[in-house]
Amino acid sequence: GNPGKEFANNRHNLGFICLNRWALDRERNFIEGDVFDYLVLPRAVLIKPKTYMNRSGEAVKQSLKLWKISEYLVIYDDIELPLATIRIRQGGGDGGHNGIKSLLNVLAPEDLKRIRIGIGRDKELAPRDYVLGDILPSEWELLNPVIDLTGKFVDLYIKYDFNAVLNEYSIWKKSCSGTESSGNISPKEENSDKGL
């Protein structure tokens, strides 16, 4: 995501929105830092980089100096996925996403776990204008359950591990496979970097 109130409800800030909702629902508060805001938990550290999306790797580099972090779970928006869909995977390339490219300059691909949330695309707008636009009320309606589900994934990751997240994701996919009316369309192949 991007820091600052002007970006708070942008589609491109969906990762921050998920973490903020997670913290609010669990009555936790992020501590403000210079390079990132953070929340230290017994088995994890949640960070929200203040370096802007395309320089997220700089914040990760700083976090590695403070804590012994062996892997990262990154939550971010994906313009190539239909609105309110989710893809979860480990490793892979940047798929043209500059924020992920920045992270991969610091981390090995296998150390990067991902939750990608679809924001859809407006073919009338340039991609940059679309991702930096605010989430519309009709989009919130579809995204709110996905944001809550992402919070559940974060809980599982913190309490157990990434495999627990993948198991819950598999159950979710089966339960909503092909359910287009709710916006929860079962994702395609998980190992593809296309559309990252």
Language-model-detected regions and their locations in the chain:
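Nucleotide and nucleotide-moiety/phosphate-recognizing core
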Residues: 2-91, 101-115, 122-126, 141-188, ...
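Short glycine-enriched, charge-decorated loop/helix-capping segments at active-site entrances
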Residues: 87-93, 131-135
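Hydrophobic alpha-helical segments within soluble ligand-binding/sensing domains
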Residues: 96-99
